[in-house]
């Protein structure tokens, strides 16, 4: 089994380097100023925030954050989203396009994931960004790092993930911006060559949030959004302030036209007056805390939470879901609806033992929808966070069916996968 795993890993790296070799021809011809954004959560929101400031002066890796995807993006291609035969096309098209396709923007703002060990490092060694923005650090894909910890390479999964993300800091040429509250980020950037700026909560002067809007009073001015934004987004805004100051560019503060990435804390109107906050794109403890804290800041009645499993937690699964139970037990939700095997097994007992909340759990997503349709009266604000295709539940509760455009996993492949769960 280990031999097969190592063979797959070697093949992955070989193929990634193949595409990197060809895409680099186009990149060298383009020669943009590269700003890399990485972290466990919040990368895509940070990418979208930079777009509000740079507009057409930059190209953004909206559909790519992996070793393969970034190479495809540089030559103007998308990765494999449907047929696997597209791999054959890409093996031919990437070399061909590398000789004639060139982006023209001054900046390349690229989102980089750390899902697999060595993936961030491969991109860091290649791109060598002028600026690295390290947004966050958490156990987003912990399952992929368990073997590194078991081998003795790292003391724990947190150290392993931090080291991988830090490769972008180690290879940054000029500037690295980090969360000053993270000791691991500070440790990993102590001896790097680039200048390090650690942002802190002192940059946030005040925070006001409602289901339909948010205002952050920051050092440079007040940022206004038309969606509910977690308080933790002050970090991205503070990082944005530091980036714009470094580049000598003016900041746009009115962000009411800003559209949050799909499945991230988006406000949607539900049937019969119910207010829906869709944050179903992903879920790990760090993002769960962020959204629960956001709801706690809202001075409104009848707060509900629909919480699904946190996947890809590996050996940390029980621990992380138990902590989730403690988080929810301390919240001010009027009703908590749990959906999935993991939250039923680990999270539910913690909330029940606390005894302060009305809580129900379901292992089937359809049963959760049935419960909501029977019990929602129209005065509730409902947070959706977690796996188990909760975006399908949101879809069924929408007042305007066209708002499915704002939901995650709406492509044909995703709809086909959820259909196997009986969710049509």
Task: Outline where the language-model segments fall.
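Short beta-strand segments
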Residues: 36-38, 111, 134-136, 179, ...
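ATP-dependent carboxylate-amine ligase
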Residues: 2-19, 30, 43, 55-56, ...
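Acidic, Mg2+-coordinating active-site environments of NTP-dependent enzymes
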Residues: 30-32, 104-105, 124-275, 300-301, ...
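ATP-dependent carboxylate-amine ligase catalytic core
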Residues: 24-29, 55-163
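Short, acidic/turn-prone active-site loops that include or flank metal/cofactor-
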Residues: 63-66, 136-139, 201-204, 360-368, ...
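Residue-level detector of alpha-helix initiation sites
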Residues: 41-45, 114, 234, 388
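Short beta->alpha connector loops
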Residues: 113-117, 182-183, 282-283, 365-366
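A conserved segment at the C-terminal end of the G1
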Residues: 37, 45-61
């Amino acid at each position: 089994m280990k031999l097969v795993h190592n063979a797959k890993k070697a093949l992955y790296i070989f193929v990634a380097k193949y595409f990197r070799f060809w895409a680099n021809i186009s990149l060298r011809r383009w020669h943009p100023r590269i700003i890399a954004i990485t972290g466990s959560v919040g990368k895509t929101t940070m990418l979208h925030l930079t777009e509000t400031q740079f507009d057409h002066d930059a190209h953004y890796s909206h559909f790519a954050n992996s070793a393969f995807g970034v190479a495809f993006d540089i030559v103007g291609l998308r990765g494999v989203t449907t047929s696997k035969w597209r791999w054959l096309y890409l093996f031919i098209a990437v070399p061909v396009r590398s000789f004639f396709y060139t982006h023209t923007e001054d900046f390349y703002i690229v989102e980089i994931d750390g899902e697999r060990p060595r993936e961030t490092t491969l991109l860091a060694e290649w791109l060598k960004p002028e600026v690295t923005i390290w947004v966050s650090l958490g156990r987003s894909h912990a399952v992929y790092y368990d073997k590194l910890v078991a081998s003795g390479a790292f003391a724990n999964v947190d150290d392993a993930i931090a080291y991988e993300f830090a490769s972008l800091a180690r290879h940054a040429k000029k500037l690295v911006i980090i969360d000053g509250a993270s000791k691991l980020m500070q440790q990993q950037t102590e001896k790097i060559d680039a200048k390090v700026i650690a942002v802190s909560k002192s940059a946030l002067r005040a925070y006001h949030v409602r289901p339909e809007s948010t205002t952050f009073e920051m050092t440079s001015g007040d940022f206004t959004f038309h969606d509910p934004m977690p308080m933790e987004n002050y970090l991205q805004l503070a990082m944005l302030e530091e980036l714009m100051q470094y580049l000598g560019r003016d900041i746009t503060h009115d962000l009411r036209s800003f559209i949050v990435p799909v499945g991230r804390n988006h406000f949607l109107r539900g049937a019969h007056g119910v207010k829906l906050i869709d944050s179903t794109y992903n879920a790990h403890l760090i993002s769960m805390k962020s959204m629960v804290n956001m709801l706690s800041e809202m001075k409104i009645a009848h707060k509900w939470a629909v919480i699904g499993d946190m996947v890809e937690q590996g050996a940390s699964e029980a621990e992380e879901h138990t902590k989730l139970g403690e988080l929810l037990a301390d919240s001010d939700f009027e009703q908590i609806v749990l959906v999935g095997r993991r939250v039923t097994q680990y999270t539910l007992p913690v909330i029940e033992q606390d005894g302060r909340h009305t809580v129900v759990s379901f292992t089937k997503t359809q049963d959760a929808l049935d419960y909501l349709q029977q019990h929602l009266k129209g005065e509730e604000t409902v947070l959706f966070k977690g796996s188990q295709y909760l975006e399908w539940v949101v879809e069924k509760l929408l007042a305007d069916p066209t708002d499915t455009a704002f939901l995650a996993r709406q492509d044909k492949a995703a709809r086909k996968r959820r259909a196997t769960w009986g969710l049509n």
